[in-house]
Regions:
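Cytosolic regulatory regions of ion transport systems
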Residues: 1-251
Length: 251
């Protein structure tokens, strides 16, 4: 479920990234918007080819969400517009409505105001990004190290190359009575096993900042997820036995 069409170019860019996503490229898409660019009454053909259904209606209305079969969706993506900051509030309320009625649906949204991010957890919203923070942060990094944007573009696109991932499985699910181990020993084990990953850090909870490049002596907790770079998603749970065995030999 995709909510809002801030512009056709942005929406098509989102469709392109979804086409590259192994998790979402084969899932039918429903587009919901209260209005279209240029006050169009119908979506153009180049966009209609990328979706299954388009529903014109107020996304924050429960009736509209039911027409869109929101309860059957795997996820809902909300897009925002810098020219309409109030859309952040509407998106937050709509995403909160989905979480209240269908908590199994993954909800993520872009925020034109950075302060909106702080409200997402209150409504049970699963994730969000601040377009303003990203833009300003990248601008200064590009100033300090020209070319950093190309690195970011490589990592943030689903079209190929390397991406940043967060492991689906928690460290504690890798095995019963697993002894605690350090971040450094995990990196050494991954290197010696020639795993196709570059371990960057850990993520404790969705609402916390990830711990990137921590000290090697940091002990991983059972609820921690691995933040890593790879060309495709790595099956940590499926490879956990040999990883733990290698770590055991190191200690």
């Amino acid at each position: 479920l995709i909510v809002n069409v801030p512009s056709y170019s942005e929406t098509m860019e989102l469709m392109k990234e979804l086409d590259y996503s192994p998790d979402y490229k084969h899932i039918p898409r429903v587009l919901v918007a209260s209005h279209l660019p240029n006050n169009d009454r119908e979506i153009p053909s180049f966009l209609s080819q990328k979706i299954g259904t388009f529903i014109m209606g107020l996304p924050s209305a429960l009736e509209t969400l039911e027409r869109a079969n929101a309860g059957q969706a795997k996820a809902c993506v909300f897009t925002s517009a810098a020219s309409d900051p109030a859309l952040d509030d509407t998106n937050t309320l709509t995403a909160g409505l989905i979480e209240k009625n269908w908590p199994q649906v993954i909800t993520v949204m872009t925020c034109s105001r950075s302060e909106t991010l702080g409200n997402l957890s209150t409504f049970g919203i699963d994730g969000g990004i601040s377009t303003t923070d990203l833009q300003m942060g990248l601008l200064v990094q590009e100033l300090e190290d020209p070319g950093i944007y190309k690195v970011y573009s490589e990592l943030s696109s689903n079209s190929g190359g390397n991406q940043i991932y967060i492991s689906h499985s928690k460290v504690g699910s890798w095995g019963e009575n697993t002894q605690s181990f350090s971040f450094g020993s995990l990196k050494i084990a991954a290197t010696q096993l020639n795993l196709p990953v570059e371990i960057l850090g850990i993520q404790k909870t969705t609402n916390e900042k990830p711990v990137l490049n921590p000290e090697n002596k940091l002990l991983l907790g059972s609820a921690d997820h691995i933040v890593y770079m790879a060309r495709k998603r790595f099956d940590w749970l499926g490879n956990s036995s040999k990883i733990l065995e290698k770590i055991k030999k190191l200690t």
